[in-house]
Every structure is written in C-alpha cells, then in structure tokens.
C-alpha cells in the first residue's frame, strides 16, 4: 500500500490508495464516516481495468480536526478491529 496525495487543503485531502481495491477502500470509507468531524468521505476507482487497485479518496472535515488526523484515527480503528477479530478466533480455536 502506498498513499499518493493529490490535493491538500486545510480541511480537504484527496489521495490515491495505491495497491488496494474495493475491499480495503470500502472498509476505510465506512470507518471515516463514523467520525463526527467528517463532512464528506468517498472514493472512486477511475478506470475498472487500468486503475483497479488505485482508489481515489476525497476526505473533507468540518475544520475542527484535519483530514490527516481523521485518517490516522480511522487507521487505528481498523487496526483495533482486526486485532479483536484475531483474538476472537484465537479464543474459538483455544489458543
């Protein structure tokens, strides 16, 4: 995964999420929408064949926190949820 910033303003961030597809992009988008300071979050895949693994995101906040802060919080939430799934599986497997 690599992030390529396209546009950065005080409360707007546009970037490509290289190496990912709808699977991770949709998860990130859903978690971004959970943040009360996000006024818009969405992504597109500009060409389904040529850019299938390069979603383009746009994140807009209310200005109380930056889009970068929102993304950091979202990444931590995704990490925490993945850890919870791992722990639940370990419990089921008796590990």
Swiss-Prot record:
Listed EC numbers: 2.7.7.6
Gene name in the database record: rpo11
Coiled coil stretches, renumbered: none
Entry GO MF terms: DNA binding; DNA-directed RNA polymerase activity; protein dimerization activity
InterPro entries found in the cross-reference section: RBP11-like, RBP11-like_dimer, RNA_pol_Rpb11_13-16kDa_CS, Rpo11-like
Organism: Thermococcus onnurineus (strain NA1)
Localisation per UniProt entry: Cytoplasm
Protein's UniProt name: DNA-directed RNA polymerase subunit Rpo11
Sorted UniProt keywords: Cytoplasm, DNA-directed RNA polymerase, Nucleotidyltransferase, Transcription, Transferase
Swiss-Prot/TrEMBL catalytic activity: RNA(n) + a ribonucleoside 5'-triphosphate = RNA(n+1) + diphosphate
Physiological role: DNA-dependent RNA polymerase (RNAP) catalyzes the transcription of DNA into RNA using the four ribonucleoside triphosphates as substrates.
HAMAP family (alphabetical): RNApol_arch_Rpo11
Any one GO CC term of the record: cytoplasm
Any one GO BP annotation for this protein: DNA-templated transcription
One Pfam family per UniProt: RNA_pol_L_2
Subunit record text: Part of the RNA polymerase complex.
Database matches in Gene3D superfamilies: RNA polymerase, RBP11-like subunit
Origin superkingdom: Archaea
Similarity-based family: Belongs to the archaeal Rpo11/eukaryotic RPB11/RPC19 RNA polymerase subunit family.
């Amino acid at each position: 995964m690599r992030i390529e910033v396209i546009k950065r303003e005080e409360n707007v961030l546009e970037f490509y999420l290289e190496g990912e597809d709808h699977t991770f992009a949709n998860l990130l988008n859903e978690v971004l929408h959970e943040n009360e300071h996000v006024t818009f979050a969405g992504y597109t895949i500009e060409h389904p064949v040529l850019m299938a693994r390069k979603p383009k995101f746009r994140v807009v906040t209310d200005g109380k926190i930056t889009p970068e802060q929102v993304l950091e919080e979202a990444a931590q939430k995704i990490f925490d949820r993945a850890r919870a799934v791992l722990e639940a599986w370990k419990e089921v497997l008796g590990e």
